């Protein structure tokens, strides 16, 4: 049992091969105006719009989580604190009796907060692709500007960086309200 839980959680944090896909045509173009879930430390985490930053939202289930680092590492290196990077885990398939174990494993494996969606309602509302990393670029209003799913590769990371750059440049061009 411990081995199964360890394997489940190990795959929640770490690259599998699949070509990234662009956003399907029937997916929403706006994120919910507010998402509030608890993280692995049982602290409430809130993502609400309008906000102040460009947000990179990663969404994954057990298998898709293996692909997250391939996206987040180069984006964090390039953009640093200029973007808000948030993680959302689909843990809706975890049986209720194992939730505490999963939460504790998450605590040991991830030092940054990851929103845990036990019901699956939030990930469903965001129309994520199961078994793949899902990466969404959201502007300060919560509009989904770019959506990619699958494993990162140099071209897909470059495309995502270009989308983020466009948002940051457009935001810098607009005069701030005084």
Give the positions of each predicted feature.
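Short, internal strand/loop/helix patches
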Residues: 84-88, 102-132
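Bacterial N-terminal signal peptides
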Residues: 5-15
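Structural microenvironment flanking redox-active thiols in thiol-disulfide oxidoreductases
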Residues: 53-56, 63-107
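N-proximal helix/coil linker or "cap" segments that precede and/or mark the start of modular domains
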Residues: 14-33
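A short beta-strand-turn-helix
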Residues: 35-54
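Thiol-/selenol-based redox modules, centered on thioredoxin-like
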Residues: 131-178
């Amino acid at each position: 049992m411990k081995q199964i839980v360890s394997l489940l959680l190990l795959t929640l944090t770490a690259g599998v091969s699949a070509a990234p896909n662009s956003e399907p045509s029937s997916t929403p173009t706006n994120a919910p105006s507010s998402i509030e879930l608890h993280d692995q430390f049982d602290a409430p985490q809130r993502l609400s719009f309008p906000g102040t930053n460009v947000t990179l939202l990663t969404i994954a289930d057990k298998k898709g989580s293996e692909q997250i680092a391939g996206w987040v590492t180069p984006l964090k290196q390039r953009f640093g604190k200029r973007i808000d990077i948030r993680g959302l885990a689909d843990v809706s398939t975890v049986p209720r009796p194992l939730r505490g174990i999963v939460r504790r494993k998450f605590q040991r494996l991830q030092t940054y907060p990851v929103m845990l969606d036990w019901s699956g309602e939030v990930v469903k509302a965001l129309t994520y692709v199961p078994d793949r990393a899902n990466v969404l670029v959201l502007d300060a209003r919560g509009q989904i500007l770019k959506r990619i799913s699958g494993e990162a590769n140099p071209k897909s990371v470059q495309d995502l960086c270009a989308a983020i750059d466009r948002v940051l440049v457009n935001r810098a061009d607009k005069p701030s309200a005084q």
